[in-house]
């Protein structure tokens, strides 16, 4: 599998309480098939953060990768925006 074929998402870190693991909330908008109203959807992904460098509130880019643990199939690739302390 090439790296270009891997899924990439952008989201906000909502939990940094685990060691080397971050919970990233990815929000998106879809159109309802029958009523055609735009609906906001959100999903949480557990992502691997090797250096523990992200904090809660950071906007990050995550990429699909091989399973790291039972729930982790994503890794943090880039920090787009840091939170102000």
From Swiss-Prot:
It comes from the Bacteria. Pfam families: Ribosomal_S17. InterPro entries: NA-bd_OB-fold, Ribosomal_uS17, Ribosomal_uS17_bact/chlr. GO terms for biological process: translation. Keywords: Ribonucleoprotein, Ribosomal protein, RNA-binding, rRNA-binding. GO terms for molecular function: rRNA binding; structural constituent of ribosome. Coiled coil: none annotated. Signal peptide: none annotated. GO terms for cellular component: cytosolic small ribosomal subunit. One of the primary rRNA binding proteins, it binds specifically to the 5'-end of 16S ribosomal RNA. Belongs to the universal ribosomal protein uS17 family. Part of the 30S ribosomal subunit. This is Small ribosomal subunit protein uS17.
């Amino acid at each position: 599998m090439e790296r270009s074929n891997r899924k990439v998402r952008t989201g906000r870190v909502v939990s940094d309480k685990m060691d080397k693991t971050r919970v990233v909330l990815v929000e998106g908008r879809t159109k309802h098939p029958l009523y055609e109203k735009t609906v906001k959807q959100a999903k949480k992904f557990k992502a691997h953060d090797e250096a523990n460098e992200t904090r809660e509130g950071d906007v990050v880019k995550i990429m699909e990768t091989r399973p790291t643990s039972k729930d982790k199939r994503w890794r943090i690739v880039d920090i787009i925006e840091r939170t102000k302390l």
